[in-house]
Each structure stands twice: as C-alpha cells, then as structure tokens.
Amino acid sequence: MNHSDSTSYSDITLIGAGIMSATLGTLLAELVPHKSITIFEQLAEVALESSNEWNNAGTGHSALCELNYTEQNAQGEVKIERAMKICEDFQLSLQLWSYLVEQGKIDKPQEFIHRIPHISFVQGEDNVAFLRKRYQQLSGHHLFSGMQFSRDHAQLAKWMPLIMQNRSATEILAASYIENGTDVNFGSLTRKLCAYLTQQGKALKLMHRVKDIKQLANGDWQLTVLDQQQQQIIHRTKFVFIGCGGGSLPLLQKSAIDAGKKIGGFPVSGLFMVCRNPELVAKHYAKVYGKAKLGAPPMSVPHLDTRFIDGKQSLLFGPFASFTLKFLKQGSVFDLPKSIQASNFSSVMAAGIKNLPLANYLIKQALLTKEQRMVELRDFIPDANSEDWQVLVAGKRVQVLIDGEMRFGTEVVTAEDGSLAVLLGASPGASISVKAMLDVLLKCFSDELPAWQHKLQHMLPSYQISLRDDAELYATLKRRFEASLLLDQ
C-alpha cells in the first residue's frame, strides 16, 4: 500500500453505489444542485450487490400480494396498517421515477419497470379463510381497488396457468389477483440514476473502498479511502450517507456515533431457482406470492415471479434463505465475527438466543440439495422438471439487531447532529427507497426542509399528503405515472 496520502473534499459523500445512494444523490442533486457530491463504490461497477437485478426478486413492493405484510392476530383479525403504509410509500418511488422520466433526466422506463399482475396464492382451508379476510379488508380501499378473489380452479387457471397445470380438482386453493403490480429492475434503475448524477458533475469513484471514518473536532467527517491502485486518499466532507448494504454496519461501527453502538447484524444468504425455458416462461405472467410455512421466517415467503432482465423474460422461484457469515456477496467470512463488539455484545447475544430456531432453520436450508429445493417448487408447479431450473445465488441481507430484537425491515440510523446517516436492514428496501431517503432528509436536513418544500412537492406530489385518505389525488397520480412510465401500454 502506498501511504503517500492525497486529499479531496465534497459537501456530500455517499458510500455505496446502490439504489439507496443513487436515490439520495438524485434528490440532493435536485434540491441543492450547487453542492458537490462524491459517491465511493468499492466494486468495478454500480449496483453489483443487493441492488443488482439478479440479487433480488425485483418486486415493486406495494403490499398487493405479500401476505407477510398483513398478519393475522390471535383473534383471527387481519391487520392491514403495514400494507397501507408500504403501498403509500411505494407511490413516492413511482412519483420520483415518473418525474425524472418526464423531465428527461432518465429515459427508457421500459428498461427498469414493467406492469405485471400481483397474485396471492394459498392452499388449505385455514389459509383460504385468511386470504378471504385479507381480500375483504383490502379490496374496499382505493389503494387496492380492482383486487379480485377466487377459489374456482377455472378462474385460477386463467390467472396462473403454469401453477394450475395438472392439479387435482379436489385441492383446496384460493388466490387474490390485482393487475397493477410491477416488476422493477433495480440494477437498471440504479445505473440510470448514477449516469444522471455524473452528467450533473457529481463524482462517482469506482474501485474506491472506504476503510475508515471518523468525525473531526469541527463536525466534518474524515474518510480514509483506498483507490484502485491501493493508494490512500483522505476525503473530508460535511455530510455522509452510508448506503452500502451489508457493508454499512462495519462503517457505522467505525463512525462511533452513539446511535450505532448497540446495533448488531445477522446476515442471511439467498438462493433462487431460475428458469429460462421459453415454453414455460410463456405460460406464467405474474408475481405469485405464497404463505411462509409454519416456523419459517418472513424473508422466506415463497414466490414465483416473471422477471424482465436484459430485455428477456425468465422465471424466478424462491427465496431459499440460508446461513452465512458474509455481509456482502463479495464479502468475508469474518464479517459477522468482526461485527460483534463490546458495545453490542449483549444485544447480539440476546437476539441470538431468541432466534435460535431461525439459525437452525437457515442451517437446514443451506444443506438442501437441488432436488430438495425442487420439492418446494412443486408446491407451486406440480410437474416442474429439475432440468428446466438452475440454482442462482442471490444477494446477502443483514437483518438488524437492536435491543436484543431482530428487526425485519428497513432502518435509518443517524448521528445526533444530523451529519451522518446509515441505511440498514432489508425488505421492502429498494421499493421504498424514496421514502427511506426522505426520512434521511427529515433527520439530517431539517433546517433546510422548509426551503425545499415547493421543490419536493413538485417532484413528489403526494409529499406530506396521505394518499390513503385522498382517493381523487391517488387516481390522478396513478394515471400520470402509468403514462410516463409506460405502464398503460
């Protein structure tokens, strides 16, 4: 390593060139175009980790079909509050993407988003009863208007012919169906956003690894960065956003901010089965979500998805969650051990004890053979042929451990003075990237927000407005983004 340090400066620094940094960078480039922005990415291209199209399922998470967003309580009531929030949050993402296309800042929306039906599919009387309750709760609300429910095998065969092929007429099945779901290629979208940022003069530094971060006495942050020649750069900045997926927790710990001292992480690896057989691909056009098996964690909800990648359709089934020590796909087996420190030891251990069944489940999942995975796939496609499917290793997710609890969601952690923000967690993740980054603005740029209000409402017409309470505005905005994102074609 060459220790002849060079120095650099920017007003704003983003670590990790994934969908979160690209979204925050885009918002800030619009709000404060005169501010300098630097993005550091340790890999050779943007969007190679969690945001990459092959490392996630590409569902535009809006709670149209994901059953784990509408849980049933002990009294048998189906709670829809989380579903409403996720659906509303996803509308903000659609609005920003629509604005960027309308303004000519990004192009060819068909390269990153497609209209595709979202279907919930269940088996057995208890699950059918649950799905009916869910449908009754959601379908009357304008956010979920157009949702249908059926137990009729003939109708189900129209919605999902591949799944219904060669099924017994006596099987107890049901599905809900809604047309206005989406498949999102977050890799393509991230590349478009980063291209826009570089066009605006923002600096994108690939093959640059941030190895240390500390706050200076004047409140600025000093980053120690290794470039592609392994030369050390000292980079100073007023504001830092750490949005590098599984790489965020180690940097949060190095920052030494109080809010991060007791936080731990639990990495989970993902696998999918992928099918590119044109005959099978042509028989399925939907994202079909099932119900997690008893004892299985939320991240293991099975689904069979149509995907659009590189202009081609394919089918994806999974995910198969499994145990890993790595925080990133291109990470190290020492990631988890090194993340356990004196400050978070008790929290990590408490969460570990509470989640021993999860660890056991993940280890068992890791040991499954391809043929054992095919058995699970055949719950969806009864006559699935092993030769048509290949195992695909997807990305890593790091579940957040806080106060001895494992959080299944997306968390924003900030320094008390608002000079640093960190994005942690997983699903619904990329789908609500705009809402997550608005939370960063709220926590870190609260003094500037009043001056930004008009611009934010121009970009995001439902900003600070409840779409769940305004059916007319929702319908107006839906027509607008469907037209600009070519979802009405």
Curated annotation (Swiss-Prot):
Catalysed conversion reaction: (S)-malate + a quinone = a quinol + oxaloacetate
Keywords: FAD, Flavoprotein, Oxidoreductase, Tricarboxylic acid cycle
GO molecular function terms attached to this record: 2-hydroxyglutarate dehydrogenase activity; L-malate dehydrogenase (quinone) activity
EC number assigned by the record: 1.1.5.4
Cofactor(s) named in the record: FAD
Classification via Pfam families: Mqo
Gene Ontology terms: biological process: tricarboxylic acid cycle
Pathway in which the depicted protein is active: Carbohydrate metabolism; tricarboxylic acid cycle; oxaloacetate from (S)-malate (quinone route): step 1/1
Name of the top EC class for this enzyme: oxidoreductase
Family: Belongs to the MQO family.
NCBIfam families in the cross-refs: mal_quin_oxido, PRK05257.2-1, PRK05257.2-4, PRK05257.3-2, PRK13339.1
HAMAP family reported in the protein's UniProt record: MQO (MF_00212)
Protein name: Probable malate:quinone oxidoreductase
Lineage of the organism: Bacteria, Pseudomonadati, Pseudomonadota, Gammaproteobacteria, Pasteurellales
Gene this protein is translated from: mqo
